[in-house]
Amino acid sequence: NYGDGVWGKGYGIIDKGAYKIGVISLLGRVWLEGHLDPFQVADDIIKELKKETEIIIVDFHAEATAEKKAFGYCFDGVVSAVFGTHTHIQTADAQILSGGTGYITDVGMTGPEESVLGVKKEIIIEKFRKGFSGMFETADTPAFLQGCIFTVEKDSGKTVEINPITVR
């Protein structure tokens, strides 16, 4: 949902042979200004993707949990799943909304677990204490993987099961 003149596009279709998956990546606008309305852009993209598939997954990259939740409710029953990204902390609210859309506010991150957003914790602590810091450096601690597995019924496009995962 960047405006015209920016390269790339934030959606596409993955052809798996027996079925197709529509994938959309959108940016929220709360504390991340400068983007087109993700709700309107989603409406437009979904109309196009629905011509080819009922399975549509949305990565909603946003800061505010309320904006993510509102987006999930707005598109409940319209898309298969909405998962939030950006905050790097997996939330404990994975659910299937009443219209059949799988939802989680944030899927978490993959990277060094003993870190702040993947960065050496001392650097981030210094930033908060002093108002500035040195260059960000990736933490050199054991990694972990977080995410969410959505099981989607291919004909209806509805989520039938949702399982957050953490692998250490």
Residue ranges and their predicted role:
Residues 1-168:
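Acidic, metal/ion-coordinating pockets
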